[in-house]
Every structure is written in structure tokens, then in C-alpha cells.
Design a protein with these regions (language model features):
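A short, amphipathic beta-strand motif
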Residues: 27-34
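Acidic, glycine-anchored loop motifs typical of Ca2+
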Residues: 89-97
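Beta-strand signatures of extracellular beta-sandwich domains
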Residues: 42-46, 84
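Sec/Tat signal peptide C-region and signal peptidase I cleavage site
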Residues: 18-24
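A short tyrosine-centered beta-strand micro-motif
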Residues: 79-85
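Exposed aromatic-hydrophobic patches
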Residues: 69-76
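Extracellular beta-sheet/turn segments enriched in Thr/Pro/Gly and aliphatic residues
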Residues: 106-146
Length: 147
């Protein structure tokens, strides 16, 4: 009984401290073509069920922008994921568009997936596989307006 209580306490402490689970795989996402150091780079990693609809804690991060590239690190269970990112240059916490829906900030999707007719790519087009040994993916920011 005492061993079960101690094992449960250790598991709870591991989760509380944010220590990655033993089965997690390292994922490195490099966002390149960052044109200025203004604002933040906002990145979310999705599974198929929440593609572009739900920002899940632990898979949604913001880092200060820096000219060139910004690198994000995650520890996630092996599986199929897709990522979306944007350069929140004005720091308002949202992806800005003009009245016609034209993007005013740089953005990118994993797997080099592109916007078609002002529609984001499908999960299948943007998805990649995270194997148990880990992976590195690069997302190339695209700016439709001057930076």
C-alpha cells in the first residue's frame, strides 16, 4: 500500500513539475525568414481533431521575435502533428488581416503547406510524423505585406 502511495505521489510530482513523460519525443520547430525583432512569434502544434480551432496548453507557445529564425522545443508523444505560426509584430496576441482577409503579418504552416484561395491548408497537407527518436521541422514565414 505504501509503495502505491509513493508511486502515485512521484507520478503527480513529475506531472506538476512539467517533467516530460518517458514516452515523449523531442520536437524542434524552427521558424525562419523572421524579418524583424518586433513582437513575438506565436506557434501552435495541432493534432487532426483540433486543426486550427483549439489552442491546446502545452502545444501553444510564444517567443520573442528575432531577425532570422526562432526555435521552439516541445516534448510530445510520437504521432502525427501539424503546426501553424505567425509573426505577431504588433504584439496584440492575434493574427491581423485587412478588411478583405489579406494577411498583415507573416505566417507559415508545417510541411511547407500553402494557402489556396485565402483558405488555410488541410491538416493532411500540413502534417508531419513525429517518430519516437524525435524530429526537426522548419516553417518558412511568408509575408504578404512589407515587414
Amino acid at each position: 500500500m505504501k509503495a502505491k502511495v509513493l508511486a502515485g505521489a512521484a507520478a503527480g510530482l513529475t506531472l506538476a513539475l512539467g517533467v516530460p513523460a518517458a514516452h515523449a519525443a523531442p520536437l524542434t520547430l524552427v521558424v525562419d525568414n523572421v524579418c524583424s525583432a518586433k513582437g513575438e512569434i506565436d506557434l501552435t502544434v495541432y493534432v487532426a481533431a483540433d486543426w486550427l480551432s483549439t489552442r491546446t496548453e502545452g502545444r501553444d507557445r510564444q517567443l520573442p521575435a528575432q531577425v532570422g529564425s526562432v526555435t521552439f522545443q516541445f516534448d510530445l508523444p510520437p504521432g502525427t502533428y501539424a503546426a501553424a505560426t505567425f509573426h505577431d509584430a504588433n504584439g496584440n496576441g492575434k493574427f491581423d488581416e485587412n478588411l478583405l482577409g489579406w494577411p498583415l503579418e507573416g505566417f507559415a504552416f508545417s510541411n511547407n503547406a500553402h494557402v489556396r484561395f485565402f483558405r488555410p491548408p488541410s491538416f493532411a497537407a500540413a502534417s508531419f510524423t513525429l517518430p519516437p527518436e524525435g524530429a526537426t521541422e522548419t516553417l518558412h514565414l511568408d509575408y504578404w505585406t512589407k515587414c
